[in-house]
Amino acid sequence: MTYYEEVMKLMDEIWETQFGIIKEAAGIFADKVRADKLIHVMGSGHSHMIAEELFVRAGGLANVNAWLDFNLIPTAGARKTCKLERLEGLAKIIWEEQKIDTDDVLVIISNSGRNSVPVETALLAKERGICTIGITSMKHTKMTESRHSSGKRLYEVVDLVIDTCVPHGDGLLHFNGVQGGPASTLAGVFIVNSIVAEALSILNEAGYELSVYGSQNVDGYCNEDYYRRFKNRITHL
C-alpha cells in the first residue's frame, strides 16, 4: 500500500466512526458562536500545528483563541519541548496567561494523550467546569501509561473524545519493522476543519450571520472588524 492509499483509508475510518462525535463538537462550536464565547484550542509538540490550523484561518471561525506557547513548539528546541510537555505545573502557568471564561470551550489535542501538559490542562478545565473536547489516538493512548501523577490520560478527563484513528506509533507504513508516513497531523487537521465546517453549516441553516475570516491574499477582503472585536480577548491576535 502507498502512503496515499493508507491516508485515504484513515480518512474513511475517521468519517465512518467519528462523524457523530464531530457533529456533536460542531454543535458546541455553533453554540459558542451564538453566545459570543470563545473556542480555545491547544496542543504541544507537533499537535500545536493542529491548534494553529484553527487560528485566524481563511474560512475559519473568528472566535478561536489558540494557546501558542513558545515552550511547547518544536522551534523552541525539539528536545527541550519534549521535556517541557512532560513537566507538571507548566500547564497552570500557560493557563494563567489566557482569558478563558467558564462558558467557553477548550479543545485539547494530543495524539498520545499521555503527557502532563495536555492532561493537566484538561484537569484544570474540569475543576472550573469548562467544557473540554479531546482529540487523541485511542489506538495509541490505550497502549501507553500516563506521564501525569494523576495516572490519567487525556481521554479519561475530557468531556468529549474524538479519535484520530491513527495507529500506535503514528506511522501508516512499515519498512522492515520501521514505521514511516506519520498521520496524526493530517488526521487532526481533517477533524478540526470538519468540526468547523459542520458548525458553519448549523449556523448557516439557522440564518445566523457567519463570523469567518477571509483570505488576506484576496484583494478587497478585510478582517479588521474581527481583529477589533476580539483583540482584547484573544491572546495572540
Model-derived regions, located:
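Short, surface-exposed alpha-helical recognition segments that flank or form part
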Residues: E16-G20, C82-E85
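Glycine-rich phosphate-binding loops that contact phosphosugars or nucleotide phosphates
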Residues: V41-V196
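Generic N-terminal amphipathic, Lys/Arg-enriched alpha-helix
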Residues: M1-T17
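Conserved, well-structured ligand/cofactor-binding cores
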Residues: Y4, E88, K92, K231-L237
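A short, well-structured juxtamembrane/interface segment
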Residues: T17-K32
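Short active-site oxyanion
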Residues: D36-I39
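C-terminal functional extensions of proteins
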Residues: D170-F175, Q179-L237
